[in-house]
Amino acid sequence: MGLLTFSINVTLDGCVDHQEGIADDETHAFFTRLMDEGGAMLWGRVTYEMMESYWPAVARGDAEAPPAMREWAVKLEAKPKYVVSSMRKDFPWTNSHHIAGDLRTGVQKLKDATPAGVLLGSGTLATELDRLDLIDEYKFLVHPRIAGHGPTLYQSGLPSTRRLELVSAKPLRSGVVAMHYRTYRRDRGAVEGEGWSGGAEEGR
């Protein structure tokens, strides 16, 4: 079974608005590496549609973009992409797949079928999956910004505090800090896995 890793850009005050992040070569390289290491991407419908509206054009060369962004786009095009949605059934973007029905069952099956791990990049969906205790690791890029507005992580709340263990913290040149935490499990401490190996924004 692969790990489910939640990764997202977040400001110091918890804002996950993608326009508030620092989009430079280091941050794109960070997410490209995570995508390379993981076996699949997992998004909610809103994030999928945001990504679908831009990245396929970059991958085709129809939109201008720096080399780091183009590398990300080409690799994303080839990566299996899974979407949780109760409103939309058709997902024509290359290698896109729909997760329908019971959320716990569908995501657990995806984890079981993806030994390299699944990379989750939707904040609202992450809240739902955390309520189901399905997230194993968290790899956040914490940006040196105070946005003063939402949307924010976990703004709809969790039933209880989530206990995590720090694996590593790596500062980037821009002042962004790459934080890696794993979920604490009472039966065996933290979940297995080291370093940055293992399994990029908003909800359904």
Task: Label each PLM-derived region with a short phrase.
Residues 1-204:
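Enzymes that bind and transform nitrogen-containing heteroaromatic metabolites
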